[in-house]
From Swiss-Prot:
SMART domains: ANK (SM00248)
Keyword terms of this UniProt record: ANK repeat, Repeat
Pfam families: Ank_2
UniProt organism field: Acanthamoeba polyphaga mimivirus (APMV)
ANK repeat spans: 22-62, 63-96, 100-133, 137-170, 174-207, 211-241, 245-278, 282-313, 317-347, 351-384, 387-420, 424-463, 470-499, 506-542, 546-578, 674-704, 708-738
Protein's name according to its UniProt entry: Putative ankyrin repeat protein L88
Keyword Repeat on entry: yes
Transmembrane segments: none
InterPro entries in the record: Ankyrin_rpt, Ankyrin_rpt-contain_sf
Length: 879
């Protein structure tokens, strides 16, 4: 009886014991509750007496069941045969399928043992049920009956369907026939009698399914029923039939060598002439299948060997039966048997693996280290190398997958050599260093223990691979993923801390490189490792192939918070004066990063206040020995930088720079091969006054010349956009009168190289400083002189350059700033009179009394110095 509540149109009710559905009609409800009520069938008859109710007799519920499907499925259990009959009489359709494609006839055939099946099936067939209808899997009523003839269905049902012309060789979606279904289930749900019946009615004994398998193959695969095998063979089953993978019946039977009666089945097939050396598409024989799948049952293996199976036959990949057994078996017994029968223990397959190789890398899957021990005891080559690596390395490779640390220990205990390199030049230890990184944190402890085990068994931490790496440099290459414990372990076992790779990078250099752009967490880890390496004696001055030391790498970093590392490196005697291949010193790197930050920081002022219109340049006065300008150098003080959110980073970078500048071994005026100092470099690339002032405050010499003869002033006038940088250099006693190698002084060099605006500012500040022209041949050159000829010299330069069309605009800008009464031609009367005045004021009598000036004396009507004095005073207001 179905245990259900009262009928509810929206309720959920059972279609049969294990399947519930919504959408039940009142008729469906009356059917499943028929035997709950003594008048159950009468209620159904009464309900169907109403023509209105009959109209909905074929209505489906949500699972696709009709009232007839439910009645047939539960006939004899919840309802009666009489109910099935009245439904058919009232017009219930026999071929309506539920959502799984099952018709009432299929239900009846499957369940005929419990539902008055013979009578129900006859009744359904009488009312036009399609005997060959298929469900969604392609199963027919005959297939269901044949599969279950010894359980839910019956032999009689199968015969009834066959007598009513059911198609005996129809196939389901997988290509299985009724005979195949019966053979698959003969041990449990079907019977030999059913198979004999199907064969009697003409079932095709050698029909094949979608995989090319026959009924005999299915029998060998699933039943292991000796009587069935003999029946099929006696009825003409093809013993040498081959499925689409090339498997024969003997291979299939050998594959299930651990099953009941498997030995007898194999023996029957062999005795009936099955080819014991047949091969499938992988060239595997029945013996190979028996070895691969037998596990602890060796009977079939022994039988095949006794029947003459070749123990050394190889498959497509050159695997032998021993290799397959060592790879897949969970028992040592098949391996023992094969070895006792003379199997070659050191045969290798196409990948170079012997039986021990494969036993080791699969030791975790089978949880059996006894196979490994047996193969070693029987003389397997423990140091065999496959196409790439040794057995020990392969075992370590599969740690956490197919192998385990116990297997590694067994190998090491039996003298496996951890120092044999693989084809890439890496030993087992070097391989594990990479695996330690690759596997990540989840397997870190496991890999750490394996590395320690290898070191305990004399693995050489200083073995050098083809990339010139030892274990420490190999790990350090992945410095962002390394923790300090593994580094400590290698150091404890004597790894060479200063070994370098092909790029001349030591572990210290590699970790410093990682600090350049690492995140906070990684940076913290790398810092600790750097400190450890220094404590353990790492050479702080190793130079890599780019010419960088640890200090220069750190100084080039974008990370502002590396003061402690810089301090630590310097404390360990890092050389701050090295030059890399880019001709940079650590100081140059550090000041350039500081300058870069200042330039790109939005909150740093881009223009420091300056007085570019000043008529004086205090640097010239200072250099000449005159009194300092009233404008103090402190106007350039870094304290003027307004406080902002970037101030902490500015302070960090400034601190790093000052630390290096103040270190006792730092040569602030150190020159590279091109003669460039940190100050020259900064003046050449920067518009920021702060880093330049830091250098000058710490003793940078502004008058050092590079290989071109250029000083900081030369660099500044050419590259900077700010007159303040030039003025700052002058305030720190930069000499504006130093010549370049090509004979150019500062002003003429500025005129040639600097921007128009800068040249105007430079020239304006030189007007009141003593200069003169060297010669008529080099009119644009201005040099220091005791003579007060600066205005004339400037005019001469302007007059000369005004002839150059491209520079005429500069002349136009400067000329209004010169006294308007001075004419352009220096040989004119006014120019000569002005020169005479200046010579007199300087007291240069020798230069006044010349033949050239006699014409002027005559013009002025003077005969002595007193008259000349009066005349000069008189004409001062007119020239």
């Amino acid at each position: 009886m179905a245990t259900v509540g009262e009928y509810d149109v929206d309720g959920e009710f059972p279609c049969y014991t294990y399947e519930y559905s919504k959408g039940f009609t009142k008729l469906m409800y009356l059917i499943i509750t028929e035997k709950n009520n003594p008048n159950g069938h009468k209620n159904i008859v009464s309900y169907l007496s109403d023509k209105k109710n009959v109209k909905s007799i074929n209505q489906k519920n949500k699972k696709g069941y009709t009232a007839l499907s439910i009645a047939v499925r539960n006939c004899g259990n919840w309802c009666s045969y009489k109910t099935v009959r009245i439904l058919l009489e009232k017009g219930a359709k026999t071929n309506i399928k539920n959502n799984e494609g099952i018709t009432p006839l299929i239900f009846a055939s499957f369940n005929s043992r419990f539902c008055e099946g013979f009578n129900v099936i006859n009744l359904l067939l009488k009312y036009g049920a399609d005997i060959n209808a298929r469900d969604n899997n392609g199963y027919t009523a005959l297939m269901n009956a044949s599969s279950n003839s010894n359980s839910s269905s019956t032999y009689t049902t199968v015969k009834l369907l066959l007598d009513n012309d059911a198609n005996i060789d129809d196939k389901d979606k997988n290509g299985l026939t009724c005979l195949m279904h019966a053979c698959n289930n003969v041990t449990l749900k079907s019977s030999i009698g059913t198979i004999e019946l199907l064969l009697y009615y003409g079932a095709d004994i050698n029909a094949v399914d979608n995989n090319g398998r026959t009924a005999l193959m299915h029998a060998c695969d699933n039943s292991n029923n000796i009587e069935l095998i003999e029946l099929l063979l006696n009825r003409g089953a093809d013993i040498e039939a081959v499925d689409y993978k090339g498997l024969t019946c003997l291979m299939i039977a050998s594959k299930y060598a651990g099953s009941i009666n498997s030995v007898e089945v194999v023996e029957i097939l062999i005795n009936r002439g099955a080819n014991i050396e047949a091969r499938n598409e992988k060239l595997r024989t029945p013996l190979m299948y028996a070895c691969k799948y037998s596990h602890n049952n060796t009977s079939v293996i022994k039988l095949l060997l006794d029947k003459g199976a070749n123990i050394e036959t190889t498959d497509l990949r050159n695997n032998t039966a021993l290799i397959l057994a060592s790879t897949y078996s969970s028992s040592v017994e098949p391996i023992k048997l094969l070895l006792d029968k003379g199997a070659n223990i050191n045969h290798t397959n196409d990948e170079g693996c012997n039986a021990l190789n494969l036993a080791c890398i699969n030791s975790s899957y089978n949880n059996n280290s006894e196979i490994v021990k047996l193969l070693i005891d029987r003389g397997s080559n423990i140091n065999n190398m496959d196409s790439e690596r040794t057995i020990l390395t392969s075992t370590c490779e599969f740690i956490g997958k197919g192998s385990n640390i116990d297997t590694v220990k067994i190998l090491l205990d039996n003298n496996a050599d951890p120092n044999i390199p693989n084809t890439n030049g890496n030993t087992t230890l070097l391989y594990m260093c990479k695996k330690y990184i690759k596997d990540g944190p989840k397997k870190r402890d496991l890999n750490f223990n394996v590395i320690k085990l290898l070191l305990d068994y004399k693995a050489n931490p200083n073995f050098i691979n083809k990339k010139n790496e030892n274990s420490l440099t190999r790990l350090s290459k992945y410095s962002d993923k390394v923790d300090i414990e593994i580094i400590k372990l290698l150091l404890d076992y004597g790894v060479d801390i200063n070994s370098t790779n092909n790029y001349c990078n030591s572990a210290l250099l590699l970790f410093c490189m990682d600090l350049q752009n690492s995140c906070t967490k990684i940076s913290y880890n790398c810092k600790n490792i750097v400190k450890l390496l220094l404590e353990k004696g790492a050479d702080v001055n190793i130079i890599n192939s780019n010419g960088n030391t640890a200090l220069s790498i750190i100084c080039e970093s974008d990370d502002n918070n590396l003061s402690d590392i810089i301090e630590l490196l310097l404390a360990h005697n890092a050389n701050p004066n090295t030059i890399n291949k880019e001709e940079y010193t650590p100081l140059m790197h550090l000041i350039e990063r500081f300058d870069y930050f200042l330039t790109n920081s939005k909150s740093i002022p881009q223009n420091i206040e300056s007085d570019s219109d000043s008529d004086s340049m205090s640097g010239f006065e200072s250099y000449r020995g005159f009194s300092q300008s009233s404008k103090s150098v402190n106007k350039y003080n870094l304290d003027k930088i307004e406080k902002n959110k970037n101030e902490p980073e500015i302070n960090y970078r400034q601190k790093n720079l000052e630390m290096l500048l103040k270190h006792k071994t730092t040569k602030i005026n150190f020159q590279n091969s091109s003669g460039i100092t940190a100050l020259l470099h900064e003046c050449q690339v920067s518009d920021n006054i702060e880093p330049i002032k830091l250098l000058l405050d710490n003793g940078a010499d502004p008058n050092i010349q590079d290989e071109k003869g250029e000083t900081a002033l030369h660099k500044a006038v050419r590259h900077t956009n700010k007159i303040d940088v030039i003025k700052l250099l002058m305030d720190y006693h930069a000499n504006p009168y130093i010549f370049r190698n090509k004979g150019q002084d500062l002003l003429s060099y500025a005129f040639k190289k600097s921007s128009r605006r800068n040249f105007v500012n430079i020239a304006k500040n030189l007007i009141n400083n003593p200069c003169h022209v060297l010669s008529d041949e080099n009119r644009s050159q201005i040099f220091e002189s005791k003579d007060k000829e600066n205005i004339i010299s400037i005019i001469k330069m302007l007059e000369y350059n005004a002839k150059i069309k491209a520079k005429f605009d500069v002349t136009i800008d400067l000329m209004p700033q010169i006294a308007t009464q001075i004419i352009y031609n220096h040989k004119s009367l006014r120019a000569r009179l002005l020169k005479l005045k200046w010579l007199y004021m300087c007291g240069d009598i020798d230069k006044i009394i010349t033949l050239e000036n006699f014409e002027l004396f005559d013009y002025l009507c003077v005969e002595n110095m007193y008259q000349l004095h009066d005349k000069i005073i008189g004409i001062s207001d007119h020239i």
